[in-house]
A protein has these predicted regions:
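Secretory/export targeting leaders with adjacent low-complexity proregions
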Residues: 1-138, 143-146, 150
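C-terminal soluble interaction/assembly domains
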Residues: 140-166
Length: 166
């Protein structure tokens, strides 16, 4: 669940891209964006989540369907990034001695960050990449959008990165 407004419970923003985001090259890191509140109060918030882990994994996925507290839904898709390469927080957990490599999964990462909020946010900041979103006007029965701006088809679509696949 997400909220249209920031509240004590829903305090983690899902952002659209700012105008000054460069088309190529790097911008601020995840930690700089979040710790310095550079986007705060600029009207770039699409929604507010209650859990930073959900926002982090939404950024990894690149698109999703938001369900608001009032029951409405909104489709969002990739709207740009800060240009930094993704760095695995799972590998960082192994490097820090938190888990062995064979123990790490998305579920393990999510649970550990939720159990360790301060250290968890530090861990998420290990990944400097930050993804921005845009609202998508697509019917609810369609799947999430892929790199070609088409709805994905279960058991048929494959993940690609347009930087590497034309």
């Amino acid at each position: 669940l997400v909220s249209r407004y920031r509240t004590a419970e829903y305090s983690f923003p899902i952002y659209r891209a700012p105008k000054e985001l460069p088309k190529t090259g790097q911008w601020l890191t995840r930690q700089q964006i979040q710790d310095d509140n550079v986007l705060s109060g600029r009207g770039l918030e699409i929604a507010w989540a209650s859990d930073p882990v959900d926002v982090f994994f939404l950024q990894i996925q690149g698109s999703g369907r938001l369900r608001f507290t009032d029951g409405d839904t909104l489709r969002i898709g990739y709207g740009g990034s800060n240009g930094h390469k993704y760095r695995s927080v799972g590998k960082e957990m192994v490097r820090r001695g938190i888990y062995n490599e064979h123990q790490v999964s998305a579920t393990v990462i999510k649970n550990w960050v939720r159990r360790n909020p301060q250290d968890g946010l530090d861990l998420l900041n290990h990944n400097p990449s930050f993804v921005f979103f845009r609202e998508i006007d697509v019917s609810d029965h369609k799947g999430p959008l892929g790199a070609m701006n088409r709805s994905l088809t279960p058991l048929r679509s494959v993940a690609i990165d347009p930087k590497f696949v034309p």
